């Protein structure tokens, strides 16, 4: 399996809790990609604990909101992991910053694999949390994995739909979809010629005055000291 270069110092965008213990862990999915995660355990906990795997939002890293969710749930008595999806953050996989519903659904199932074999986890009490664009991935995983006993989708956004139809279905027409395919195909040609891959996504910068409120909310988190992280595509894309 791929050897990862993991940062050992605390580099989250939120303060470290004195109620939990934290460590870096790794696990692999069925595609052979090694994933990096932060594990949060209630301090002083004994016996087998309920566990939760957390990931998202789309384009974010575990040092941002997913880690905050994981740490908070650990304060409430759960053993938790917040993980970087395949191709993202400290996790493995190339080319970087690829999103795939199949692989990213598998990432959640792989997180359940990992949690299921931990000595201090009750394998009959494992849940998952998917945030924003990862809410859909969490629901996908829960639909196929009977080991997942509880699922929460927080502020879920359907990334497959927005990719196909645009925000607010603004590109939901035969002509718009054809033009999008033409642009993507032309970009493939250019990528092959240049030997690099063009990145899409991220948060618009500078922020237009007429941007929708949800885009302003994205900007206020990912592009400011409140939520900026150097490994996050949302912060740097």
Predicted regions and their residues:
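Alpha/beta-hydrolase fold nucleophile elbow
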Residues: 119-132
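Alpha/beta-hydrolase active-site loop
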Residues: 65, 98-119
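Glycine-rich nucleophile elbow surrounding the catalytic serine of serine-hydrolase chemistry
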Residues: 130-140
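Conserved alpha/beta-hydrolase
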Residues: 72-92
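Short beta-strand element of the alpha/beta-hydrolase
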Residues: 47-57
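N-terminal cap/lid segment of alpha/beta-hydrolase-fold proteins
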Residues: 2-47
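The serine-hydrolase catalytic nucleophile loop
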Residues: 59-71, 85
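Alpha/beta-hydrolase-fold enzymes
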Residues: 139-225
């Amino acid at each position: 399996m791929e050897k990862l270069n993991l940062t050992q110092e605390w580099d989250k965008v939120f303060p470290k809790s004195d109620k939990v213990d934290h460590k870096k862990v790794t696990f692999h999915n069925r595609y052979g990609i090694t994933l990096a995660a932060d594990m949060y355990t209630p301090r002083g906990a004994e016996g087998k604990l309920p566990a939760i795997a957390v990931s998202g939002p789309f384009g974010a890293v575990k040092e941002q909101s997913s880690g905050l969710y994981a740490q908070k749930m650990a304060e409430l008595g759960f053993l938790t992991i917040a993980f970087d999806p395949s191709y993202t953050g400290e996790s493995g996989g190339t080319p970087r910053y690829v999103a795939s519903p199949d692989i990213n659904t598998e990432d959640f199932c792989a997180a359940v694999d990992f949690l299921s074999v931990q000595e201090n986890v009750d394998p009959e009490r494992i849940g998952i949390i998917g945030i924003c664009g990862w809410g859909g991935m969490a629901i996908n995983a829960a639909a196929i994995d009977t080991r997942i006993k509880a699922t929460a989708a927080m502020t879920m956004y359907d990334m497959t739909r927005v990719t196909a139809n645009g925000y607010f279905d603004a590109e939901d027409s035969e002509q718009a979809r054809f033009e999008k395919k033409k642009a993507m195909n032309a970009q493939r040609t250019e990528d092959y010629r240049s030997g690099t891959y063009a990145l899409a996504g991220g948060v618009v910068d500078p922020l237009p005055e007429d941007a929708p409120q949800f885009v302003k909310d994205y900007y206020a988190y990912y592009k400011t000291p409140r939520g900026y992280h150097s490994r996050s595509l949302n912060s740097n894309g």
